[in-house]
Amino acid sequence: MRHPVRFLAVLMAAVLVTPALLTAQSATEVDERQAFFDEIQAPNWLGTDIDHTPIKRQRGGSCWSFSTVAFLESEVLRTNEDVVAALKEAREDLDLSEYYVVYWAYVEKAREYARRKGENARFTDGGLSHDVTWLVEKYGIVPEADFAVVEDYSAMRTDLNAVLKAHEESGDWTEDAVVAEIREVLDRHLAPPPETITVAGQVMTPIEYATEYLALDPAAYWEITSYTDVPFYGRGELDVPDNWWDYDGYYNLPLDDYMQTINQALDAGYPVVIDTDWGDKGASWNGAGIAVIHPDQLDGAAIDQASRQLDFVEGRTTDDHLVLAVDHRVVDGVDWYLIKNSHGTSSGRRGYVWIRGDWMAMRVLAYMVHPDALDPSLVDQFGGNR
């Protein structure tokens, strides 16, 4: 069963509310919100031992690509000494194209939409980390310099939707025709994806660049979650709208193991890309750069497997945003996670956010990490299958 969409009930009172009163109330709410965040003792540093690339500013609903491409960049920096040496010599940062991945995501979404004849199909901006690794495995990746950044995301979306609307009206769901028309729109707003690129004087395909030059193994990574509708130490689907092709390969852990695993991974120097909720009272991503569980959200409940499950089922936890975790610190016995966001350096804490352990336990739906970061005993629980 799909969990319900979060909604806001608005109660209308039979009183006259003046603009001045509204302004005063708004100011009070802002002051209370600021006071709440001022009292949160988040770490005041932004340093980390996990190498990662500079903060970017996404356009449109492509956080899933920005975060997971940043994750792959960080993985290259962690594992590929030759690429790191070449970057240092050239005084450059590794900069892979998020929109190359977005291009192929829309192609595959259109293909799936046509196969389902528009029924129970999703053609939205959203996506998840496994979309990126699957697409990089299938189509490779290219440097940012070799593929355009979209100039008007809204206009592109309008034109893409118009293609599907025309096919809905005609009833013609010929897959090749739908994909060809979608690609024409993408070629116009972005660019035709290159068949070859030149890197360090070598001509190579995007797949060769990904798997040989960067030495990425996109299929190696695990997505881990913690919900009770799938047996623990089994694999299943994360039932959220952005899982548009119903991927069912998530590894499901009990909450204690789920938390221990991400802590262990970050402490050992592995980057982790996380799928998180966005809009609680205790979160100020672009302002204070803090995300914690506000006491009002708990209503006296403990933070445990049952409350995590309940908030997911009842729609209080939704998959709103994907970001990259690049550090874990324990301050006065409290877990904190340093997050590289994709809203530019003017948001949050110079583009970073500190997530507290309670938020990680309650509002982070899943994360992707290299299985080498896992305790071998956990891998054994899954039959040793990496």
What are these regions (language model features)?
Residues 9-20:
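Bacterial N-terminal signal peptides
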Residues 26-49:
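N-terminal regions that are enriched for targeting/export leaders
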Residues 64-80:
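Alpha-helical support elements that line or immediately flank enzyme active sites
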Residues 91-200:
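Papain-like cysteine protease catalytic cores
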Residues 1-9:
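Bacterial N-terminal signal peptides that target proteins for export
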Residues 49-61, 117-124, 171, 245-252, ...:
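Second-shell loop/turn segments in exported
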Residues 31, 180-386:
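Active-site signature of cysteine proteases
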Residues 62-65, 97-103, 132-135, 143-145, ...:
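Structural recognition of the beta-strand scaffold that forms the well-ordered cores
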